[in-house]
Structure formats: structure tokens, C-alpha cells
């Protein structure tokens, strides 16, 4: 963890402690410190996706492609505002998988 922002380091540590090893990131100005920290953290692989509507489905595909009986969680990091709402269709789809 390399950020000088304490909350970013805490978030990265929490993700790691919950077994998150893959993160789909939609870089923006507001989440840049988080994206940078995740990208620099050993053991976490970032997958950049520019479209938030697709990012949730990409994360679901990565998780479902995991051959283990209990796939590891895949996180999605988007910027603030309506970007989060663009993940809603993928969240609904993942819930019913």
C-alpha cells in the first residue's frame, strides 16, 4: 500500500483481508488515489474498463470464470456520482446467478 491518504490504505487493506485479488477499475479524477494504490499493491490485479455499464459485467465474468468451487470476490471501483448507478444492472444479474 503506497498512498499517503490513510483511508485509501485502509480500504486496500480491507479488500485484501476479504480475499479480493482482482479489481475492475473505471479510472476517474475522484477515485484516482484508490486506483493508483490498488494498481501498486502486490497481489491485486487491476482490469481497467472505461465504461461503468460494462465494468460490472466484466467483474461478474471474471468471478464466474474462476474454476474453484467458491470463487474469490472481484471488486469494482468507479468514480463518484451516477457512475455507481451504472453498475446496478450487473449487480442485479450477479445476485440471481
Give the positions of each predicted feature:
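N-terminal alpha/beta PP-like core and its mobile active-site loop of ThDP/TPP-dependent enzymes
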Residues: 1-97
Amino acid at each position: 500500500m503506497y498512498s499517503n491518504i490513510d483511508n485509501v490504505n485502509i480500504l486496500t487493506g480491507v479488500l485484501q483481508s476479504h480475499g479480493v485479488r482482482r479489481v475492475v477499475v473505471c479510472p476517474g479524477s475522484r477515485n484516482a488515489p484508490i486506483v493508483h494504490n490498488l494498481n501498486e499493491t502486490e497481489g491485486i490485479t487491476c482490469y481497467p474498463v472505461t465504461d461503468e455499464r460494462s465494468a460490472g459485467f466484466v467483474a461478474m465474468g471474471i468471478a464466474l470464470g474462476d474454476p474453484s468451487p467458491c470463487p474469490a470476490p472481484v471488486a469494482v471501483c468507479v468514480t463518484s456520482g451516477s457512475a455507481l448507478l451504472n453498475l446496478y444492472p450487473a449487480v442485479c444479474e450477479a445476485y440471481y446467478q
